[in-house]
Curated annotation (Swiss-Prot):
This is Large ribosomal subunit protein uL15. PANTHER family: 50S RIBOSOMAL PROTEIN L15, LARGE RIBOSOMAL SUBUNIT PROTEIN UL15M. One of its GO terms (cellular component) is cytosolic large ribosomal subunit. The keyword Ribosomal protein applies. Keywords: Ribonucleoprotein, Ribosomal protein, RNA-binding, rRNA-binding. Binds to the 23S rRNA. Pfam families: Ribosomal_L27A. GO terms for biological process: translation. It comes from Nitratidesulfovibrio vulgaris (strain ATCC 29579 / DSM 644 / CCUG 34227 / NCIMB 8303 / VKM B-1760 / Hildenborough). PROSITE patterns: RIBOSOMAL_L15.
Amino acid sequence: MRLHDLYPFPEERKTRKRVGRGSGSGLGCTSGKGNKGQNARAGGGVRPGFEGGQMPLQRRLPKRGFKNMFAVKYEVINLARLLAAFEGKAEITLDDIYDRGLCSLGSAVKILGEGDVTTAIKVEAHKFSASAVEKIRNAGGEAKALEG
């Protein structure tokens, strides 16, 4: 038996729905659309969200707030994860973080303070939490915040 000889069993293949082909097929006559009415007609049916003339939910609810298109979205990395990825390294740059795959390329990075710093390290990122800066400085290291 070769790869081109493989085929699914006939009962495993789902047959398409053939409508309007006689009453013996189970989908003859009205073709599964029921009797008369808007949904039985060609091109029939109502648009999404239509509630039969009642004021739709989308219009009943008030508009609120807005999305700030200039908001900066930071990808967060905890100190524990950062130190595990760069064990024994004294200086961690933003390019190192991107190369190691800790966050997606070009994204803004924020370092959070979960984990313990035992050695002096120099870390480069866009933002740091207060606890992360404190832990890095207490270990004799430096937290360098970048612009952008």
